[in-house]
């Protein structure tokens, strides 16, 4: 499906080499200030051609709001946004009419629909995520205005090069409390806040690019100032919805929240997060945050933090022995312009999908609070 969310809903449209990509966002409350200037910064962070570490495809990715606002205010009606595809080269994909790319969606899309886009990855292309980022920027503004929510993602691993993300380490927890987007972006195109490994990550990507290959990595994201009570019991737990959102991003291959897989080797006596009463905020807090801000599927007011691994980009120009759709063995060396590592550009996409989940959860909780007030 191309629609995500229940009350705060987004439908994305477009393929890699069609005339435009974009989205329709429904459920945005009326009266909220909104212009293209609120959306463009995140699209600019996502756009290709930012450095030698990304694809050279030259897209400006300028957003145009088509409906749902008037005089800079939302009307409460669906908001349509369009971004033109300006640097199309469909001829780069002529060989892929015969060969499904290894580990790409060419084969599975063809099997599912009986047809596939002849240029690029179609809906499986990362160009589809432009609509996510545009709608996520609206969700972020809604969250910031309602609860001062902050969402910051950053790169913690490229290939074998990794920074510390030990959830039991006070230094890492301090980083989660203080990291900002300005700090992340100040580290250059790699977007890793640890200067001691950022340069090594750049060299790692350059090494694989030089070999006409690609490499994967990990994005970590933190959410601060989220209210308590968001998320549903059982099937729509907050971490389940976040996992759903993250695993819908192209090239993502997993999800872990809080202590994640690291927590399985820690006894409950050390893993539990004891409570204390904080007078300044007049509420219960936890002394540690191994739960990652979610207990029983519901936000507890602490930082939510999670990590998402992204696989090596499937489309590479290195020769690969593979087979055509007809089963004939052959050699594929993909043409086109592709990222040697998608992880740094995934940052605003992870932030956007996080914002969409949380905006939806906040609206659902507000509806529940209203119904409870009516009953009582």
UniProtKB/Swiss-Prot annotation:
A molecular-function term among this protein's GO annotations: chorismate synthase activity
* Region entry Disordered, spans: 39-61
What does its record list under induction?
A: By amino acid starvation. Expression is increased in response to DNA replication stress.
Q: Which Pfam families match?
A: Chorismate_synt
According to UniProt, this protein's pathway is: Metabolic intermediate biosynthesis; chorismate biosynthesis; chorismate from D-erythrose 4-phosphate and phosphoenolpyruvate: step 7/7
What is the documented function of this protein?
Answer: Bifunctional chorismate synthase and flavin reductase that catalyzes the conversion of 5-enolpyruvylshikimate 3-phosphate (EPSP) to form chorismate, which is the last common intermediate in the synthesis of the three aromatic amino acids phenylalanine, tyrosine and tryptophan. Also acts as a flavin reductase (FR) able to generate reduced flavin mononucleotide in the presence of NADPH.
Q: Which PANTHER family match?
A: CHORISMATE SYNTHASE
- Family as reported in the entry's similarity comment: Belongs to the chorismate synthase family.
Q: What is the protein name for this chain?
A: Chorismate synthase ARO2
Q: What is the lineage of its organism?
A: Eukaryota, Fungi, Dikarya, Ascomycota, Saccharomycotina
- Give the gene name: ARO2
